[in-house]
Structures are given as structure tokens and as C-alpha cells.
Design a protein with these regions (language model features):
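Alpha/beta enzyme core
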Residues: 1-2, 35, 40, 47-256, ...
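N-terminal basic, low-complexity leaders that serve as flexible interaction/assembly modules and, when applicable
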Residues: 1-46
Length: 268
């Protein structure tokens, strides 16, 4: 498929990047039902790590099989499939070339103490991504956690290594931790800040949560009110978060959030 002008315009925003990085970005942007539109939907399947197998897959036992998720992403016409090392390896041969993959390089689990600092363990490498033909690496950061600075340093090093071999980086920027309230995790000022941090760390694709109109930080709240920043609708909040990602020069995707009914999804 010939690359569209829309995709060419997006790639032009990634100045200073090598052809390998841009080629892999194009590979994802030109795949699936949204190919060429500049829009992107990624299927992320790391729930087994985060929540355990029964909580993740018991309602649909087919989900225990990694091949199911590959095929789901292909059949749905998505742009890419993201998962931890073991799941990507389990279908790498059977589905080679059929769907771009994103290797999730760090993960957490729900067996740890609630008092442990919010953090994730590095569980895969850039060399794994190369070996498996992945289109990108993925990494989660927790702005607001006491461990956030360590996470920033980890992804900075991994991002540099990945870019040197032509692999883009997707950063899941999910605010949480000791310095942020539960409502603050999806507050618009915090969501925009999370997008900015990911962009500053060099993310080629930024994944954040859809935000509410809550303003968490009192200093930021004053600026939002004084400057009349419109955060009244979901569309305006999405627009503002994209503005925080270098004025729309970086691809931003949004997490689906908590489980909800079809009507709520359509309303979003």
C-alpha cells in the first residue's frame, strides 16, 4: 500500500530520527482498517502479568492462548499488538508479518505489597525486540511515584538503544503513586503533564489515560482558570493532551480505561 500524505506529514514531525524508526512507525500507521488515516488502535495484552490469569481470561478462556490475541488484532484490523516477551514469542513464527508487534519491556504484578513503591520490573530487552521482528518497544512509567526517576532513567537508556537499531519507543505514561490521589490519576492537568513527560523522554508514541475535568495541582488549577483553558468536554481534554505532546507532533493514543458497557464506549 502506498503511503498516504497524512502519514508522510506525521513522519515529518519526527526530525532527527533514522529511517528505521520512521519505517517502523509507518509500518504501524499503514496497517489495519485505519491504515493511512493517521489514527491508531493498539491491542495491549499484559493483563496476565498485571492481574493474574483467572481475572484476565476466565470470562473468555480462549484468552489463555497467546495465538488468540494475535488473531484478534488481525481480525479486528488493528494497527499493532502489544504484549510481554513470553506472549510475543509464543506466536512470533505463526503470525510473522501479519501484524506489527510491540514488545512490552517492563511489567508489574498484583501480588506485591500495597506499601511497595509503584514500579515495574524490566522483563525484556531491545535485542529481544530485534530477534522477534517487533515494530516497537513499549515501557510504562509512573509519574508521581517515588520510583519515577528510576523509571525515567531506565527508559532513557533503552530508548537510545532501540533508536540506534531503528526501533521506535511507545511510552505508557500512567500517573500514580505516593504524590497523587486516585482522582488525580485521571485529572486533566496530570494527564497533560504525563504526556509532556513522555514526549520529553523521547517517546515516539505516547499512551495516556482519558482524563476527567478534575484539576489536581493547585498551582496548575490557577493557570487553567486564569488562562481560560477549555476542559469542559472529552474532546477538548483530548485536544489539550495532544497539545502537551509537542503541539501534536507526537502520536498520542488513549487507554480504554476501566471495563464498561458498549453504550459508555460509544459515548466516549
Amino acid at each position: 500500500m502506498q503511503m498516504t500524505d497524512t502519514v508522510k506529514k506525521i513522519l515529518a514531525n519526527y526530525e532527527g530520527e533514522n529511517p528505521g524508526v520512521k519505517g517502523n512507525l509507518a509500518r504501524m500507521l499503514m496497517t489495519g482498517k485505519l491504515a493511512g488515516t493517521g489514527k491508531m488502535i493498539i491491542l495491549p495484552v499484559d493483563q496476565g502479568f498485571e492481574h493474574g490469569p483467572a481475572r484476565s481470561f476466565a470470562k473468555n478462556p480462549l484468552g489463555y492462548d497467546p495465538h488468540y490475541h494475535y488473531q484478534l488484532a488481525i481480525d479486528a484490523g488493528l494497527n499493532a499488538y502489544a504484549a510481554p516477551l513470553g506472549m510475543i514469542e509464543a506466536g512470533a513464527d505463526s503470525f510473522a508479518g501479519q501484524i506489527p508487534t510491540i514488545l512490552k519491556c517492563n511489567s508489574a504484578n498484583s501480588l506485591m505489597s500495597d506499601t511497595a513503591g509503584k514500579n515495574q520490573a524490566v522483563t525484556a530487552t531491545v535485542q529481544d525486540a530485534l530477534r522477534l521482528g517487533c515494530a516497537a518497544i513499549g515501557f510504562t512509567i509512573y509519574p508521581g511515584s517515588d520510583m519515577a526517576l528510576d523509571m525515567f532513567e531506565e527508559i532513557s537508556e533503552m530508548r537510545a538503544e532501540a533508536a540506534s537499531v531503528g526501533i521506535p519507543t511507545v511510552i505508557w505514561s500512567y500517573p500514580r503513586g505516593e504524590a497523587i490521589t486516585k482522582d488525580g490519576e485521571t485529572a486533566i492537568d496530570i494527564a497533560a503533564y504525563a504526556a509532556q513527560i513522555a514526549a520529553l523522554l523521547g517517546a515516539h508514541i505516547i499512551k495516556i489515560k482519558l482524563s476527567t475535568d478534575h484539576l489536581e495541582n493547585k498551582d496548575a488549577k490557577k493557570v487553567y482558570e486564569d488562562q481560560g483553558i477549555d476542559i469542559s468536554t472529552q474532546a477538548k481534554r483530548v485536544e489539550h493532551c495532544m497539545q502537551a505532546a509537542f503541539g501534536g507532533r507526537r502520536i498520542v493514543v488513549f487507554s480504554g480505561g476501566a471495563a464498561k458497557g458498549s453504550d459508555a464506549v460509544y459515548e466516549d
